[in-house]
Amino acid sequence: MAHETPDTPGETYDFRAIEAEWSEVWEREQPFRTPDASDSRPRKYILDMFPYPSGDLHMGHAEAFALGDAVARYWRQQGFNVLHPIGWDSFGLPAENAAIKRGVDPREWTYANIETQKQSMKRYGLSFDWERELHTSDPEYYRWNQWLFLKMHEKGLAYRKDSWVNWDPVDQTVLANEQVLPDGTSDRSGAVVVKKKLTQWYLRITDYADRLVDDLNQLEGTWPAKVLSMQRNWIGRSIGAEVDFVVEGRDEPVTVFTTRPDTLHGATFMVVAPDSDLAAELVEGASEEVRESFRGYLERTQRLNEIERSTTDRPKTGIPLGLTAINPVNGERIPVWAADYVLADYGTGAVMAVPAHDQRDLDFARAFDLPVRVVVDTTQPVTGAIRIIPEDGELPDLEEVLPGRTGVALPGEGRLINSGSLNGLSKQPAIKRVIEQLEAEGRGRAAKNYRLRDWLISRQRFWGTPIPIVYDAEGSEIRVPEDQLPVRLPDTEGLDLTPKGKSPLAAATAWSNVPSPVDGSPATRDPDTMDTFMDSSWYWLRFLSPNDATKAFDPADADRWAPIDQYVGGVEHAILHLLYSRFITKVLFDLGYVTFTEPFSALLNQGMVLSGGSKMSKSKGGVDLGSEMDRHGVDAIRLTMAFAGPPEDDIDWEDVSPSGSAKFLARAWRLTGDITSAPEVEWKTGDEALRRVTHRFLAEAPGMLEAFKFNVVIARTMELVNAIRKTIDQGPGGGDAAVREATEVVAVALSLFAPYTAEDMWKRLGREGSVAFAGWRKADRNLLVQTTVTAVVQVDGKVRDKLEVDAKIGADELEALARETAGVRRSTAGRTIDKVIVRAPKIVSITTTPAP
């Protein structure tokens, strides 16, 4: 049965019939294939973050893809050769867990979901180049993951080590730091993450930390400021010094990193992280009593997550290690403690404690009655002349702020005291001097530290890229030769994928036991798979050469298309995917495969789609995209997503009106039935007022679209539709050339947001070809010159009338016209006009008083 939008007279806007017709055309003609390299048009690479195939498309996908498609369609209208591909991020835990639950191969679940999503994408009218479709779980794709790993291994960027890792006790696998949420839980399973010591593979992302921070400057203005800030904070570059403390009874010094080397004279004890390798080394030579105490404390520490350990209001705990360190600036002997508030992966795992000027150190000092020495007088100005306190001088008149008594640290800046030759200096001069002193004596150096840690890529699960390394009988690492790639995943028949804390691939003995590529002797494959963020770190390059069997991508194609001009996706990927992609791009640059260092020139983050203020989910009965499309039509959903507000804002589906969007589309579509002029009509003969509205839209909309003000452009399109309808019903009618011109402009504009409706309008207008390639028409500048303006007429501060007048009208003429309007006559009847202010051509203000 045909669908007719309610409350709309005239022709029936049957969105179901329209969708069926144009879906068939697009499937048959594949109009959005990317032309070959000989196409001389300027190029744009527009990419939406590819989805994980966990089920059908949801409302969040609907928003993101509607926005990304609008961008791609806009640049096609501007005459660009646009690359807009799609694929699936199809490895990962959800597929493996679903396969375990259902007793099937994860391939079966994954590819069934891909087919479901693909059909929904096609129904949604997305202008993808389907010939470039890829799936990261295809051996033809993950072969190049393995190739990239081998290249990094050759350069020393991939390495294996024993370390404490984040362990998900539910999914039974390790997590990168970035996959642990702020509350200490897994971003996948929600389980509380614990620490476990394992031998794992890492990528040296820290070698690129400075470049990753500094190159963010290239992205200012084209990436959201929030994302830039999140990446800077995550990398966490700190500038300071490394200071070497001699520990009595130990040959090697203990090096600590500090951002405040100026406060070295205030260091009264040292603290090491109990779970650090350093702590284990320090207690080796300690007494049995200390070692026993340490073992118990370490066990208690390992039951805590990093959030708990870092909480400032948690009571401080620790144990003395029975060791003494020597402060290099004053020779003072200070005790060495182990305490859980120090984390093993910050700096060297050891800190110099300056309790007077650091709250956590102060809390610890007060808990264990350790010395507190003030070395910064925060009451003194940091500029100007001040009194210098002698080296042996006492802190004057500061009883009430002494941290040891008040329990409140003094973290601010001021002048150095109790610091020998540094006395009287402010922070930066003191830092400079103490670093010079340390370097001269060989006891320290200027240094940087980073919050960022090397990328842990090992995963103890099946459904991922096998690591292309084998081990000989001695355990030596051997790279799988490139001509033996891909190392394919084995069949799951007879293989138990249930998480057991070790890689299920190790149980696949026929797969695991192989001859050594070096000499044919018995060897064993690495049983781990790669973090799936490896898959997505470079997928955008594979789209350039998706069917190339000889290389990951063609560097010539990369030069032609990359970097990506516009990337579209959620802010939830700010740290993980985006940071890793930036890292891998820089690696590929250093290896000579690409000529650029940043993958995404511009980034658009869309907000979330909510329901009643809450995030949607199937378990909570969230809105179903398929049902919404059945009810309102695809175009109405797409238009609603773009019209709801700025893209970065969240959309509450209860606050928007897809039915209203459907009514508007029906109204726009019916315009084509009222047009009687031929396609070749001379537009310049049409109604001038409507042409001015049309060409103002043509002139202003591109800038709005490039600034992602989609909602404003849609509002202006609605205004143009109203102007057309008014011209048809109250003006020269549907045969006027300007009506055809304006309606064609509406069709082109709607092609960005409502492609089915726009294509049907274009056909009904008698135009050949697809509206998607019709081109954005140039505005006639002569029609942008304002010849008339709306003058507002006020009486006693209230608007009583409006006049459409010549832009060059004089004050006297404008006043005379205003006095004759019906609104002014009514408002001044029985009153005396005292004063008239005229600001031609826009305002007339009349002031009255009651008549005598």
Swiss-Prot record:
Name this polypeptide is given: Leucine--tRNA ligase
HAMAP family per record: Leu_tRNA_synth_B
Organism lineage string: Bacteria, Bacillati, Actinomycetota, Actinomycetes, Micrococcales
Gene name as annotated: leuS
Assigned keywords, A-Z: Aminoacyl-tRNA synthetase, ATP-binding, Cytoplasm, Ligase, Nucleotide-binding, Protein biosynthesis
Gene Ontology annotations of biological process type: leucyl-tRNA aminoacylation
InterPro entries: aa-tRNA-synth_I_CS, aa-tRNA-synth_Ia, Leu-tRNA-ligase, Leu_tRNA-synth_edit, M/V/L/I-tRNA-synth_anticd-bd, Rossmann-like_a/b/a_fold, tRNAsynth_Ia_anticodon-bd, Val/Leu/Ile-tRNA-synth_edit
Family: Belongs to the class-I aminoacyl-tRNA synthetase family.
Pfam families noted in UniProt: Anticodon_1 (PF08264), tRNA-synt_1 (PF00133), tRNA-synt_1_2 (PF13603)
Reactions catalysed, as given in the entry: tRNA(Leu) + L-leucine + ATP = L-leucyl-tRNA(Leu) + AMP + diphosphate
Coiled coil spans: none
Binding site for ATP: 618
Record localization: Cytoplasm
Motif ('HIGH' region): 51-61
PROSITE patterns: AA_TRNA_LIGASE_I
Source organism: Clavibacter sepedonicus (Clavibacter michiganensis subsp. sepedonicus)
NCBIfam families: leuS_bact
Record-listed E.C. numbers: 6.1.1.4
Source taxon at top rank: Bacteria
